[in-house]
Amino acid sequence: MPAESTSPAELRAGGCQTRPVQPRRLLLIRHARAAGGPVDLERPLTEQGMRQAAAIGPWLEETGLVPDRVLVSPARRAVQTWEQASAALSSGVQPISEARIHDNTVDALLAAIREAREDVVTLAVVGHNPSVGELAGVLDDGRGDPVARRKVEAGFPAGGVAVFDLAVPLTAVGPGAATLSDFRVPGD
């Protein structure tokens, strides 16, 4: 008979002790409030947007959701959002500029996410609507937090962060493959 401290996963592995698997997470972050402008890629954050973005970092730190990999749209407002958010983080994770995020399609976002390295535990994607909101809607398997789900369905506001727990590797992320565990707009 296995010891009481043997986990179900260890039992399935024939009683062999294994390292606990750290749950993978995906953070979808919509850039904070931005100013208008004639050149989309150059639109900056407003003062309110700067405050919104600055509130994201402390929230990520306090909730233990600091990503170990960040993909950011090359648009100025997305880059500024991550710069402001990351200023409060204890880790020095450097963002990776990902042009496909600015394509603003669910397929482009999924393609970028699926290329994450195998060792990534928490991946953050800083992008734009409508693709961020649409992806949040299709990823959810319906078993997550109902309050968070209602917030996502009501619209994905500027500065919003959707937190998904993944039961699959990032390479297999797709519709219905994640559980929405939280949705916040830090600073609001």
Language-model region placement:
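Extreme N-terminal basic, low-complexity initiation segments
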Residues: 1-10
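Glycine-rich phosphate-binding loop signature in dinucleotide/nucleotide-binding domains
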Residues: 63-65, 116-121
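Residue-level preference for the first positions of well-ordered beta-strands
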Residues: 26, 122-124, 161
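Short phosphate-binding loop-to-helix
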Residues: 101-118
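A glycine-rich beta-strand to alpha-helix segment
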Residues: 120-142
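Domain-level recognition of soluble alpha/beta enzyme cores
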Residues: 140-179, 185
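Active-site-proximal alpha-helix that buttresses catalytic centers in soluble enzyme cores
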Residues: 21-104, 140-146, 156
